[in-house]
From Swiss-Prot:
This is Light-independent protochlorophyllide reductase subunit N. Binds 1 [4Fe-4S] cluster per heterodimer. The cluster is bound at the heterodimer interface by residues from both subunits. GO terms for biological process: light-independent chlorophyll biosynthetic process; photosynthesis, dark reaction. The keyword Magnesium does not apply. PANTHER family: LIGHT-INDEPENDENT PROTOCHLOROPHYLLIDE REDUCTASE SUBUNIT N. Pathway: Porphyrin-containing compound metabolism; chlorophyll biosynthesis (light-independent). InterPro entries: LIPOR_BchN/ChlN, Nase/OxRdtase_comp1, Protochl_reductN. Gene3D superfamilies: Nitrogenase molybdenum iron protein domain. [4Fe-4S] cluster binds at residues 22, 47, 107. It is found in: Plastid, Chloroplast. The gene is chlN.
Length: 446
């Protein structure tokens, strides 16, 4: 194990392995977000079984994604990958006619060195439909980084300039066109994206576009000097591509998760545009007051993050502000530059609440974590699904980290949903005690 101390924050790295949900699961929310897209996952039967089980798709639902299943002939190079992928893409175009086809590479395509990036432009010319290639394999990426690779690939497809006609129309309709363009990146449900747009509009800031957009044909314009701001902590690759390739200016802000994070996010964007934020104190205080029934349940309770979805730092920061004690933040991967503002806010909250700084363990060793959980006996462990039942059997209340990925947790109004998830096992324990039960399982399990 290696440890690096930065001021009062201690970063540790254990095994170097990822113990997370598979990153190809990003298909679950991205195909719903980009309405005119089709996702083609190129992998083995294992990938297909995972998608069927993890996404819970009905047989007759006909979702806008599919599996291109690799067979022995593909792996031994007896079949022509180019011809097979061309046939599949032609079939997709005929059946669905999407505006874009997204190829999702998996562990197997990485191991057998399939040249997806080389084949895609040729097939794109043949079928006259854009093909975006994203390598979302579990060898190189953790759970939510699948979305990061897709968005990073889509950055290259964003237009650089707007046509003269549409520009003149836009100027005539928008008198505030003097504001530098602001593009937000990260996939959110339309309702949540609208809430964040509205919060910024109240401060006099207009959002020029979102990456990804609701439709592929509406991707935002990215010119040199465009301001960009992320809404999720796992999008560091996308942020890097936006800065290096498109010369955009990244706004380094905490992420809009919880009322404290949302306020800090808005304040940072306002400061970049030289705008004095209005009524944010009252807005945040109203939200905290509305959460009081949940806060009474979590104050003084302890929580341990095993690490899965890269939302751990933001969630821990919010829970510390709620009055909880965080023993450890396990996280599969962390870009310290991209999350610098989030880490600073975490440290500030720890000082304000007079609680010790949690350990931050990158790529944690699950065996060591289990030993630490056994010693610390936290009130709650937020963990991947694989460890939930074994921990419950040992008397540790758990919550699946994957639930925070699929829940609506961004913005002022959705803070309640975070606490609803966190307090569910705590409320269950209170209900059991009311019935005279001490636990759900037999004691003395070793």
């Amino acid at each position: 194990m290696s440890a690096v101390t930065s001021d009062t924050i201690t970063f540790e790295c254990e095994t170097g392995n990822y113990h997370t949900f598979c990153p190809i699961s990003c298909v679950a929310w991205l195909y719903q977000k980009i309405e005119d897209s089709f996702f083609l996952v190129i992998g083995t039967k294992t990938c297909g079984y995972f998608l069927q089980n993890a996404l819970g798709v009905m047989i007759f639902a006909e979702p806008r994604y599919a599996m291109a299943e690799l067979e022995e002939g593909d792996i031994s190079a007896q079949l022509n990958d180019y011809k097979e992928l061309t046939r599949l893409c032609n079939q997709i175009k005929k059946d669905r006619n999407p505006s874009v086809i997204v190829w999702i590479g998996t562990c197997t395509t990485e191991i057998i060195k399939m040249d997806l990036e080389g084949m895609a432009p040729k097939i794109e010319l043949e079928i006259n439909t854009p093909i975006v290639v994203a390598r979302a394999n579990g060898l190189d990426y953790a759970f939510t980084q699948g979305e990061d690779t897709v968005l990073a690939a889509m950055v290259e497809r964003c237009p650089a300039k707007i046509s003269l006609d549409s520009n003149s129309n836009k100027e005539s309709k928008n008198p505030e066109s003097e504001q530098a363009p602001l593009v937000l990146f990260g996939s959110l449900p339309s309702t949540v994206a609208s809430q964040l747009n509205l919060e910024l509009k109240r401060q006099g800031i207009n959002v020029s576009g979102w990456l990804p957009a609701q439709r592929y044909t509406d991707l935002p314009i990215l010119e040199k000097g465009t301001y960009v701001c992320g809404i999720n902590p796992f999008l560091s690759r996308t942020a890097t591509i936006l800065m290096r390739r498109r010369k955009c200016k990244l706004i380094g802000a905490p992420f809009p998760i919880g009322p404290d994070g949302t306020r800090a996010w808005i304040e940072k964007i306002c400061s970049v545009f030289n705008i004095q934020p209005q009524n944010l104190d009252e807005r945040e205080n109203q939200v905290w007051q509305s959460l009081e029934d949940y806060l009474q349940l979590v104050r003084g309770k302890s929580v341990f993050f095993m690490g899965d979805n890269l939302l751990e730092i933001s969630l821990a920061r919010f829970l510390i502000k709620c009055g909880m004690i965080v023993y450890e933040i396990g996280i599969p991967y962390m870009d310290k530059r991209y999350q610098a503002a989030e880490l600073a806010l975490l440290e500030k909250h720890c000082n304000d609440m007079n609680v010790p700084m949690p350990r931050i363990v990158e790529k944690p060793d699950n065996y060591n974590q289990i030993q630490r959980i056994k010693e610390l006996q936290p009130d709650l462990a937020i963990t991947g699904m694989a460890h939930a039942n074994p921990l419950e059997a040992r008397g540790i209340s758990t919550k699946w980290s994957v639930e925070f990925t699929f829940a609506q947790i961004h913005g002022f109004t959705n803070a309640r949903d975070i606490l609803e998830l966190v307090t569910r096992p705590l409320r269950r324990n209170n209900s059991l005690e009311g019935l005279g039960w001490n636990s759900l399982v037999k004691e003395n399990i070793k």
